[in-house]
Amino acid sequence: IKQNVWSYSWITVQSVKQPKISSVMLKAFIVGEMDGISEELPFDELDEYLPRFPLDLRVKYFSSTKGKLSFPEGFTPKQVKFMLHYAQKPSEIYETNFEWSYGV
């Protein structure tokens, strides 16, 4: 991978006692800094092949997503942020953050 381009993958898991096919709406962001200013960049603006957000995932047990991100010059990633909700419950938003890491 060339400089400022990163491979990524994530797995969305449905953890319920009796899984059924569900529609999950997902948004993902890279939180970081550019020129000393905090920025939150959506994955769909950094990966030209990723559909526009929110992603509508069909999940029974799990769903896998992968691609390549291209960061703007001078951007330093700090965290990855995910926000999702079931399509039938848009007001119940689940959010989680992970520290940025590479080489894992």
Give residue ranges: language-model regions.
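Membrane-proximal structural modules of membrane-associated proteins and complexes
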Residues: 1-104
